[in-house]
Amino acid sequence: MNRRIIALLIAFIMLFGLMTGCASGKQETAAPETAQTESPAAEEAAAEPEQTEEVPAEEEAPAEPETVSFTDSLGRTVELPADITRIAPSGAVATMILAAIAPECMVTINAAPSESRMAFLPANLAALPETGQMYGSKANLNLETLLAADPQVVIDLGDKKGDMTEGLDALQEQIGIPVIFIEADLPHMAEAFRTLGGLLSGKADRGEFLAALVDRTTTMAEENAAKITDDMRVRVMYTTGEDGLGTNAAGSMQAQVLDMVGVENAVVVEDVSNKGGGNIISLEQLYNFDPDVILFSDGSIYDTVADDSAWSQLTAISTGKYYEVPSSPYNWLSGPPSMNMILGVWWLGNLIYPEIYDYDMETMTQELYKTLWGYELSSEEVTALLGNSTLKAAAQ
């Protein structure tokens, strides 16, 4: 009996040991699962590291604003997109300035550049839809084309005119797109480039670069003009039109370059016109003005004027001191008065007062084309541009 009991106890102990060993084996192979199915307290403890990685709401960086308030040169406060990459110019002046700072952002153009102009300008301008002009005698803004291009803002640049505030407000309400004005005549051009650099996405450096060029130009002109005494002052007439009887009189925006470099504008009239064609004068008035130098715009009678009896008696013609204003890609003095005037300041100062504006205009022309339009002028192209002015004067 005792032996049977002892045998049963031994069997029981062996069986218990086997059961314990299986249980241990199962725990080892199932360890990953049991770690995930632990008690609620253990689950919360395991989840705590994920919670601590989350940034509390109050510490998150504020979202970038979608719009910004901008006060334009007319004092109008307009809400603009914070990230501007699609712009439409209001006309020719705006086209020229915007093409210098951000051609890739332009979605329209006032008018397609001619083939000769496109040779110097960014290639994308040729394919842009034409929207016409917002202001002037040729105002013909095409709203349908403008809206189809989907700009974020319409930008008007140039000089202040009449009741612009009312006109821009009305247009903005009509099209549902922000419309702003930035003053950009010669005295305000550097500021205009800096303003555009701040508004347009990624253009701060380019805006400052162009503004620095304007500052350099105006400072140079102011310093040199101050050296010109009254007895040195040259009387200059700047003509327009095929017959040369359109004139940009003293005080006209179209004649800003003449004022800046220190010449005397020979044409003085009571009712000054700021239009591209200027004031129309008669031959009698022309004889009375009798300037020392005459500047002809392209497409005029420049080539034949020396053989024209109506003109040959004038001092400027008889002495050979008449010149043609370079006009590629745009007239360097005006037409329209925009950033092309920067070229005009360097050119006219050197043409009239080479001993004061003392630099190589051929080299300067290449530098300015590179800066403004990214175009590398060849020496042959420089000769073509300056042949009827700087190079002609140097040969006299």
Residues of each region from the PLM?
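A short, structured surface patch at a secondary-structure boundary
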Residues: 90, 94-149, 153-161, 263-266
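Short helix-initiation/N-cap motifs at beta->coil->alpha
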Residues: 73-75, 131-144, 271-283
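Bacterial lipoprotein signal-peptidase II cleavage site
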Residues: 18-31
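Alpha-helical, coiled-coil/dimerization segments enriched in small aliphatic residues
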Residues: 135, 247-277
